[in-house]
């Protein structure tokens, strides 16, 4: 029997969905239709049905008492509660967010739910029943529904229901439902907004009329992108942000440069006119780039605050700038001037990424970059994404470019709040921008604005869009611009009259004309094509002594082999480390990983920060590095490089996600913005690096020539043919060599630990100088512990990196040498190992071997001096493990022909042309490799075709 207590009402604390749940449970309790939570069952026994009192305004403004104790009322309350949640979750499906559509962008289950409740039903239910935080003036459920529909189904629409954190979700709904976002703008700000839109529209129309047919990739149709960026930048500045990083493609870029980054109109016009103008600062390299790819850095300010804004240089490869800009931000956020990990302050900088509606779901680099947003090594405290949504990709409609309702749907999987906004509603757009920056600064997470507009012209200004979208472009032709729409609104509201609006327009036009008048005629004084590489680049890296005193190396090694008392190193790892204890003593040998650690430590002691990332970089893919130790009992980590004495620079090493493109882009961006830092990316296997090929092609190899953007990024690409098949053999060195020109980077394939030590230190020494350039290293796998790659302490303490090395104990009888063999990396070690093994007899007096350690720039002077020693030389042979159409051969062939002259033959020994880098049969691989070595070392084989498929030929 129910023991109803009338003195206390526990149901008063339940509202909305929680009350709905309690009512459902009571229904089950009464009917016995299902199990009820024991605690609730006890409450039902004591207090009876959920009931409460509230003042409900009726039609005659009298208060009435409502109790949901009968089944009919329970069902109605549940329907209202569900409807409230559906409006919050699906209101966007009824919202007017597309300026090219007359009403809502689709039908939804909301309509059905609303039709199931009459106005009378809704009036009978108190507002607090379904909306605990209902604002003043909201008395009944009918008021609630009207208010929420007004909030969620107008020109601003929200998708928050996928957000997993309840605190964040509640904050977002509170911000939206409290109406604090849509407070009326002051007349001053509304006038300023109209002036901004007038400037944007006027600029685009001036370009359209003045430079007919020239590509500019107009912003028209999403003009509000500029005020949205303005709002985000200045609100960020008010929060103390020092750097705002922007990444965007070419659409609207010129307007963003001119307005957000304050690039003078006259400078923009000069670029269109191909004229030189006084005061213009070229932000391009020696070959340059088109105007809508160039970036800019500018301190932006108003009466209150200022901040530095950087618009990243950008290729036409859509979205690949995203990770680069994220790297910029992380570099700006970190203090690298202390030992240990860098100290990150995410309030110092943030990123704005402007996406295309076709590219955001279409380009995989987008999801790769989004995946970085919550990772310790890559998070930047939240990025604000803006999709400049013009509903078409070149000529492709949205139904052909994505499989989702919205172009933004990908972001849901990364727990990112989404706001859709009609680009023809300027004040709604600013509200979206304001919500975005507040959320980012509070929660340090990503936020997305889907700015939905249209594209007034074709993909470029020479394109006729009506050919492929005739109906849409009939609408667009007759559709007023957002400036005109907003001007009419301000006139109707009495903010401005027609004359004042016309004055604003005329002022903009006069300014544009005045700035255009400053531009001189096109400069045709130098009609010849002349590309001048800066001398410091053309000269290459000058020889640098990189040895470290032996006592210092020994002290470093001692520190590398120590860890805190009580720290339990994994026994197998402990043995590996302990083997390094005497490596720097007499008769000791230094393996690759130790040479690397010694180089890192010495570089840190000289004040250069280091950042190393890769999929298994803390341990090393081949279990060789062990630069981060794990306690076997607690799983705590420790890196000896964080505790070495005399270090005032940070060291960070991180395991990366399973991504190449985004991570390479990120590290490149980090290095560009932190040029004093030795930034290294390591591929798990070099074979997988080609998934970042766009970054190598567009940024790492060419960024300086195109944009003057210097980088010292180091790429560690494990490479070597060991019978492991076509996906674990080749880092595709031929591709890096094909891209090599104008001393744009260094490509090397080393054969000793000492060489690795010295080239790392050489790279660190040029950071932050005009001589800096990326370093591409084909790193070893089986050679990591190979006896012939080990080095002595004196080889580290003395000397420098050698671009070419001669094989010891060969060439001692110069007049007898007939064949000079050139090779690189593992191939060179295979030749040396065969000689040392003594298994076969070769006439070694007739052979000399040179290891080409630095493939590019090729050490021509060094090799030429070696050739001159051998007066009876008959042939110069290039030997490689890769197929003939891969590896270095096609790069080396013209070099060898030039070195050999008329009297000496040149030739190739190696595998023939193949479509796959390597075979899958380890036994066949071994047989081929042995034959290559035999051909190279035995002059009697002189250009003979053997039964096995090994290519041997001469000129």
Curated annotation (Swiss-Prot):
Record text on subunit structure and interactions: Homodimer. Part of the 2-oxoglutarate dehydrogenase (OGDH) complex composed of E1 (2-oxoglutarate dehydrogenase), E2 (dihydrolipoamide succinyltransferase) and E3 (dihydrolipoamide dehydrogenase); the complex contains multiple copies of the three enzymatic components (E1, E2 and E3).
Reactions catalysed: N(6)-[(R)-lipoyl]-L-lysyl-[protein] + 2-oxoglutarate + H(+) = N(6)-[(R)-S(8)-succinyldihydrolipoyl]-L-lysyl-[protein] + CO2
Range of residues in the leader sequence: none
Membrane-traversing stretches: none
Family, as annotated: Belongs to the alpha-ketoglutarate dehydrogenase family.
Cofactor(s) demanded: thiamine diphosphate
Entry's EC annotation: 1.2.4.2
One GO MF term: oxoglutarate dehydrogenase (succinyl-transferring) activity
Role noted for this protein: E1 component of the 2-oxoglutarate dehydrogenase (OGDH) complex which catalyzes the decarboxylation of 2-oxoglutarate, the first step in the conversion of 2-oxoglutarate to succinyl-CoA and CO(2).
Name under which the protein is recorded: 2-oxoglutarate dehydrogenase E1 component
Pfam families: E1_dh, OxoGdeHyase_C, Transket_pyr
SUPFAM superfamilies: Thiamin diphosphate-binding fold (THDP-binding) (SSF52518)
Key words, A-Z: Glycolysis, Oxidoreductase, Thiamine pyrophosphate
GO CC annotation: cytosol; oxoglutarate dehydrogenase complex
Superkingdom classification of source: Bacteria
One Gene Ontology biological process: glycolytic process
Listed InterPro entries: 2oxoglutarate_DH_E1 (IPR011603), 2oxoglutarate_DH_E1_bac (IPR023784), DH_E1 (IPR001017), KGD_C_sf (IPR042179), ODO-1/KGD_C (IPR031717), THDP-binding (IPR029061), Transketolase-like_Pyr-bd (IPR005475)
């Amino acid at each position: 029997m129910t023991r109803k207590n009338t003195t206390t009402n526990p149901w008063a604390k339940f509202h909305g969905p929680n009350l709905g749940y309690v009512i459902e449970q009571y229904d089950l309790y009464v009917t016995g239709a299902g199990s009820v939570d024991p605690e609730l069952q006890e409450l039902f026994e004591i207090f009876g049905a959920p009931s409460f009192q509230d003042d409900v305004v009726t039609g005659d403004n009298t208060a009435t008492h409502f109790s949901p104790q009968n089944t009919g009322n329970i069902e109605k309350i549940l329907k209202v509660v569900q409807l409230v949640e559906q409006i919050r979750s699906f209101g966007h499906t009824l919202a007017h967010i597309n300026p090219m559509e007359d009403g809502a962008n689709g039908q939804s289950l909301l309509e059905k739910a609303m039709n199931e409740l009459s106005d009378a039903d809704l009036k009978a239910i108190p507002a607090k029943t379904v909306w605990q935080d209902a604002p003043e003036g909201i008395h009944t459920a009918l008021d609630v529904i009207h208010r929420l529909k007004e909030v969620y189904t107008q020109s601003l629409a929200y998708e928050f229901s996928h957000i997993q954190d309840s605190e964040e979700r509640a904050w977002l709904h509170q911000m939206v439902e409290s109406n604090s976002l849509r407070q009326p703008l002051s007349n001053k700000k509304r006038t300023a907004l109209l002036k901004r839109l007038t400037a944007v529209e006027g600029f685009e129309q001036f370009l359209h009329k003045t430079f007919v047919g020239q590509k500019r990739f107009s912003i028209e149709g999403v003009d509000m992108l500029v005020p949205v960026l303005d709002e985000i930048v200045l609100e960020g500045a008010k929060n103390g942000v020092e750097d705002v990083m922007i990444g965007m493609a070419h659409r609207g870029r010129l307007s963003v440069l001119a307005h957000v980054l304050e690039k003078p109109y006259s400078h923009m016009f000069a670029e269109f006119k191909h004229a030189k103008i006084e005061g213009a600062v070229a932000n391009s390299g020696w070959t340059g780039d088109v105007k809508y790819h160039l970036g800019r850095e500018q301190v932006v300010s108003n009466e209150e605050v200022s901040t530095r804004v950087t618009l990243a240089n950008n290729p036409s490869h859509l979205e690949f700038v995203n990770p680069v800009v994220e790297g910029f931000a992380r570099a700006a956020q970190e203090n690298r001037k202390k030992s240990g990990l860098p100290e990150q302050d995410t309030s110092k900088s943030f990123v704005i990424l402007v996406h295309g509606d076709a590219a955001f779901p279409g380009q995989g680099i987008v999801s790769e970059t989004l995946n970085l947003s919550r990772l310790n090594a890559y998070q930047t405290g939240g990025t604000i994404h803006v999709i400049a949504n013009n509903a078409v990709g070149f000529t492709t409609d949205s139904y052909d470019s994505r499989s989702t309702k919205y172009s933004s749907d990908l972001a849901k999987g990364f727990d990112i709040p989404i706001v859709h906004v009609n680009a023809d509603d300027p004040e709604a757009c600013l509200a979206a921008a304001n919500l975005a920056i507040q959320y980012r600064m509070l929660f340090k997470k990503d936020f997305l604005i889907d700015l939905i507009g249209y594209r007034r012209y074709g993909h470029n200004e020479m394109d006729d869009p009506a050919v492929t979208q005739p109906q849409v472009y009939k609408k667009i032709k007759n559709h007023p611009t957002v400036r005109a729409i907003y001007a009419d609104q301000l006139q109707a509201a009495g903010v401005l009259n027609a004359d004042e609006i016309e004055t604003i327009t005329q002022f903009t036009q006069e300014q544009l004309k005045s700035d255009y008048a400053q531009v001189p005629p096109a400069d045709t004084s130098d009609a010849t094509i002349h590309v001048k590489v800066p001398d410091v680049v053309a000269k290459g890296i000058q020889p640098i002594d990189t040895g470290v005193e032996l006592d210092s190396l020994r002290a470093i090694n001692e520190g590398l082999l120590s860890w805190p008392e009580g720290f339990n190193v994994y026994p197998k790892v402990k043995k590996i480390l302990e083997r390094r204890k005497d490596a720097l003593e007499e008769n000791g040998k230094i393996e690759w990983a130790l040479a690397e650690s010694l180089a890192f430590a010495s570089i840190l002691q000289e004040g250069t920060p280091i950042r190393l990332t890769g999929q298994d970089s803390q341990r090393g893919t081949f279990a060789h590095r062990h630069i981060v130790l794990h306690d076997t009992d607690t799983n705590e980590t420790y890196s000896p490089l964080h505790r070495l004495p005399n270090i005032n620079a940070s060291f960070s090493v991180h395991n990366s996600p399973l991504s190449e493109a985004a991570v390479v882009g990120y590290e490149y961006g980090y290095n560009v913005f932190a040029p004093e830092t030795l930034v290294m990316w390591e591929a798990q296997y070099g074979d997988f690096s080609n998934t970042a090929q766009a970054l190598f092609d567009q940024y790492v190899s060419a960024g300086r020539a195109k944009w003057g953007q210097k980088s010292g990024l180091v790429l560690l690409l494990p490479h070597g043919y060991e019978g492991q098949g076509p996906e674990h053999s080749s880092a595709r060195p031929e591709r890096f060599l094909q891209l090599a020109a104008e001393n744009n980077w260094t490509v090397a394939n080393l054969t000793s630990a000492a060489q690795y030590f010295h080239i790392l230190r050489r790279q660190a020494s040029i950071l932050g100088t005009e001589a800096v350039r990326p370093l591409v290293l084909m790193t070893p796998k089986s050679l990591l512990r190979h006896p012939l790659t080990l080095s002595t302490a004196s080889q580290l303490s003395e000397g420098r990196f050698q671009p070419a090395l001669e094989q010891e104990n060969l060439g001692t009888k110069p007049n007898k040498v007939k064949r000079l063999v050139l090779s690189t990396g593992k191939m060179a070690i295979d030749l040396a190992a065969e000689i040392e093994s003594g298994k076969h007899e070769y006439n070694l007096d007739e052979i000399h071997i040179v290891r080409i350690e630095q493939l590019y720039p090729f050490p021509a002077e060094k090799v030429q001096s070696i050739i001159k020693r051998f007066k009876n030389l008959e042939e110069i042979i290039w030997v490689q493990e890769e197929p003939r159409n891969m590896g270095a051969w096609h790069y080396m062939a013209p070099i060898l022909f030039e070195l050999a002259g008329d009297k000496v033959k040149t030739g190739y020994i190696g595998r023939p042309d193949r479509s796959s880098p390597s075979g899958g049969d380890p036994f066949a691989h071994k047989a081929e490799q042995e034959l290559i070595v035999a051909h190279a070392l035995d002059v009697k084989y002189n250009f003979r075709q053997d039964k096995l498929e090994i290519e041997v030929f001469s000129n």
